[in-house]
Amino acid sequence: MNPPNNDKLPWDVRQQVLWIVRGYERQKREYLRSRMEILSTGGDRSATYTVNGEERREYLPTAHNASRTTENVATRLAALDATTAVRQIRAVERARYHIGDGLPSELADKLREAVWMNCMDGRKYPFERLYVVGLERTTFYRRRNEFLRQIAAEMGLF
């Protein structure tokens, strides 16, 4: 499913992928919060509301599901993991892991961080300001484009 390495990503696809990468931290925080909420409720159905600035939770009656607590939690976790946001999180994590493939671990770590910073803000962090010793400019941008291409392919954008 991966596109050939010599193909450039279309501009609109590249922009979509950059926004996926830039939203990664926020989406991951939201995912972890949702996951903890599901796990902490123990499968109980509840409604959360705010009264006078104080958050309260009211548990809803579930007589027909009382014995299926674990199943309810598993179902809700599976539904959460099937969302587009979680697919994007996983795609970014997998692509980020493979940024430095074939390089010594120290250089791979530096490259991974440099590509990440460049994707977050390319104007603030161009190659010249990232000081990745041992890597040429063309190699850096090729690796960054492979990172973006892998995410695009996994998300079905290209």
Can you say where each PLM-predicted feature lies in the sequence?
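Residue-level marker of positions within ordered structural domains that often coincide
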Residues: 29, 120, 145
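DNA major-groove recognition helices of helix-turn-helix
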Residues: 140-154
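Short amphipathic alpha helix immediately N-terminal
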Residues: 104-125
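Helix-turn-helix DNA-binding module
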Residues: 121-138
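N-terminal interaction/assembly modules
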Residues: 1-106, 157
